[in-house]
Every structure is written in C-alpha cells, then in structure tokens.
C-alpha cells in the first residue's frame, strides 16, 4: 500500500515519520546507562539525521542545517533547555574515615553518585556499604573528598555536560575546512568559465595517442588529477562532455562505451582521495584530526594517499578493460583548442598555479592550506575573474552539508555519545587487522547507500573515541584510522546514488545499474585490500 504526505514518496514519508520518532524517543522515553541527558538529545539528533540522510524527506543539506538548528536550540548555553539550568547540589557530610552521608535521591539506579569538584562534575562508582535510612544514605568511598558537593538529581540535564555557546555551532559554517572547500570551488568555477579545464584536458591527453587502452588511461589520469584539486562532481561533469565525442565513434551496443563512461566517475572518486580538498570525507576526517590537536599538512596527506591512488587507478583501468573490452583499434581525436589569453584568463592561470603550488609546499612555507584557500577567494573576486553571478552558482549546499557533519561530530564528542556508542564493544580484542577491516567495510558499505560525506560524519567520531580511549596506540592511531575511513568512503561505487560522479555518469543514458554495480563491486573489494595493506604496512612506517 502506497501512502505519502506533503507530496513525498512512500520512502520519504516513512523516513520523515521514523526520523521524527528517532529524534524524540531518546531524550523523552529512554534512560540509557552511562549516557548523559545531553547525550540522549544528541542521540536523537543523530538518529534523525541518519534516517533523513538515508531517505531524503528533505534535501540532505537541509538535514545538516536542521542539525545545527537543533543543536543551538537544545544543546547550547543560550537555548531554552540550558539557558537557566543550574545543577541541584548539596554538601556531603563526613561521618568517619571514608564514610559519608548524602540524600538518598543522589544515588543512581546503579548505586553510584555524581559529585561536583572544582566546578567539574565527576562520576563516583566505587561505593561500598550503602545504607539507606529514612531521608539519608550512608556510603563509603575513597574517591570522595571533604570539599565535594553531591548532585541530588543524577538525571539532571547538566550532569556530565557543560553547554557551550551557540556561536560554536554556528561557527562550523565558517570552519577552516569549509573555507578550504570554498577556495577549491571558486578555482573550479574559474577553470570552467575560462575553459582552463577543457584546454588542459586536451593538452594532457596528447601523449596518450589514439589506442583505446591508452585513451582510457589518459582520461582516468587527467580526471584523477583534476579531481584531486577540484570538486570531483564538477570534474566528472566536465570530463563526461569530453568523452562523449569519443563514445560517439563506437557502434550501438558496443560494451566498451560502458567502460569509457565508467572510467570518469571511478577516476574522479579515486582521484579525490589524493588531497584534503579532493572530496568532503577528506575534509571531515582532516577537521576531526585537527580538532584533537594533531596536524596533517597538505603534503602529508598526499604522501599517505599517493600509493593508494596510483594502485587503485591502475587496478580500475585494468578491470574496466577486462570487463568491457575495446572493439576498436584507434580513435579519431580532435585535439584542437587554445588557452585563452584575455587579461582575466591570465589572472586565473596565475592564481590557480600559485594556490596549487602553495598547497603542495605547505610543509616548506608553513602557511596552512586553509589560509591559502582564501587567496583565490579574495583574488578571483577582487580582480573580476568571477562575478556575482558566478558566485551564485557555487555549490553552497555542499558546504552546508559538510558544516552540519562537522557540527554533529562536535556534539557527539562533547556529550560523550561517541564514546558511549563504542563502550560496549571490546574493540581492543579485534586486533589491528580486524579494526582496519571493520572500519573499512562499514565505511564502504554505508557510503554505497548514504553519501560518503554522511558516512564519514557518522563513522569518524567513533574512530576518535577509540583513539581517545587508548585502543589505537601509535603508530596505528588516529591518523591511520582516519585515512582508512576517508579512503574507504571514496571506494563506494556500486550504485548511482553512491556518489555524485556516479549519478552524473548514469544521467548520460549509456550506463545501467548492473554495469555500474559489476565494476564498482570488483573495485571496492580490491580497494579494501589495498587500504588494509597500507594501514598495516605503509602508513605506520610514515608515522614512525
């Protein structure tokens, strides 16, 4: 039976209802041991966001904005929930030795207490000899001190959570990683406007001749390189227009058309792994790592990911040629085209080149890639290379999507939700191989059905919590698990909905879902093996 509300499909309607229920149940109806009230609120927001991102009753970027709105409303110090909240505390009476007298309502259902010491809340669990008499309770504990106060309502909304200013949540919209992405988007817009992308592509394809296997390799290399510094979505859209004249030379029903069409999104997804700005999961992982105080420069990231990208590109090239064999010996390629020489085009070339050079040499000059990204933002506008109409066409919704992901990860960490979610799993018993395999498989699996940005948002806080808990000792630590998550998210290529490049390629009408699934599944399996090998061998060597 089909049903819908507000013009939504059945799937979207169910997603809307289940998402709202997921938002309300944890803070209103649940009392999960070890999770603060703020953690319950965040769990509700997490469930709503995950369900909305999966079923899309509203656009995925709108879900991200809803996340920030709910955080400001329900978790900020200025919101109605915490604006006037004060912890109910009372003094602790010292009886003798390590014996204390407290109100009985201060005891939790698990016979522990929350105390306030130096304006911080602490959970005391080592209670002994608990005796309840009328309106008092006697307890023994070596962890309680003379000046401590006890919280008389263990379920109070401020227990184990100190609300932060709403500015912290709004600030994610201007997070340095967002600025980094905005700079990349503006460079991409300039490249398209002044035909730098198409002319550069034609120029770079010349060395590959006219044989099909080398043309495919050339297309994939050019796509991967552009995708490393531009949006992989924009790169795919541009490169699909480049290959259409090539595909037109093939006869109807020729399966090599499928291989050519798949080579672009697959190369874009793989190329995006190379740099921090290549794809949103990289930005989310990098932001999460930097928030812990660890630094990974632009060059560092490329050192980690270059072997993965090179091996994956060669593997994808070989797979596509084997599965969709060429039926033509040579292509007739039109390589005509000149670089524009107008003053604004020359300014674009200069800004593009300097920006990429500064990004690559970050370790040498010490200027953050986030700061460098503001050079094209200011330079392209100030010189008139991009005008207000160009700015309006930028993919702002992607920035909003990433900002919501960063903000959700912030609350999952601050409220203890991320740590609570993994506390019941003995991750330490899994071993290095099992940890890498589990995180990689989860990231690839989720990214095939959710956006890879959403997947990185959901999985990365778990990796940080494991690192914080000491389960990921160096050199197999935070950076390694972050790389596993970000790289694995980009290996999801089975379905048209898995990534925007896949969807763009599907829109040409050349591909069918089974064709994409066949190639994507093989590449995903090989990619996971490559990720595991790098995580266990290559990355630890670099980190050492």
Regions found by a protein language model. Give the residues of each.
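Transmembrane alpha-helix interface/packing and boundary motifs in multi-pass membrane proteins
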Residues: 51-58, 189, 222-232, 265-277, ...
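Interfacial loop-to-helix junctions that mark the boundaries of transmembrane helices
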Residues: 6-10, 32-40, 52-57, 163-176, ...
